[in-house]
Amino acid sequence: NVEVTATSAGKSATGEEVTMLVISIDGGTLVNGGSYRTLACNEVVDAATVQNGMYEVVWSDTQSAVTPESGQLGALLELRDGTGEDGEYKGVVYYINQLDEYARTLAEAFNEGTASYSGHADGYDSDGDTGICFFSYDGVDSATLKKNSGGYNAITAANISLSYEVQTGVANIAASSSADTTETDNNENILALIDLCDSDEVFGDCSLADYLTSMTATLGTAASYATTQSERHDEILCSVNTR
């Protein structure tokens, strides 16, 4: 959506035709003859979105957003912001969302269990205590994780962590399936957690490893397609320039 319009501005003192260029981006005028506007980059501050900490392009004078759909700038923004939804390119934001979903699903399934497998919170630690989460975010304890209104939605790939209890003592790992502290060799809950990670119940149709494999394959396919398209465009440009 970059538009360039050339109009006649009369003739110079020597009689030569003078052309005035008007260049527009996203419907706004960037250059109009001898005058011009500038663009700026503002940091996005919105903790509720994955764009938090990234930069948006705006008009310097009005601070309104610029969303070019073509050209090098448009391509770079698409590469970064593409969500993969409604035919959009699968950009950085898409893969951040995929990793966030992986982290949340892993944490919830490992902590709470699934239909066929018990979770860490279902097991018992060496003192016979139960209800302890293995994963959390930013190192908070199990109570804080469950009390948070967002619950597991607060977990991202960037902030997933071991819970405070597990970080502060391996004795808090719920290895046993029984509250009986005399069963020192009971590791049934740990074995169930291992089986859970290999099962298809975590994501409903694939295991944790399968999910990552699928995401990596998607990224590889996209990279290969982009490389092929770039080479093809270079060949076309070279052909045009040599005519």
Regions found by a protein language model. Name each.
Residues 1-243:
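Structural signature of extracellular appendage/secretion-system components
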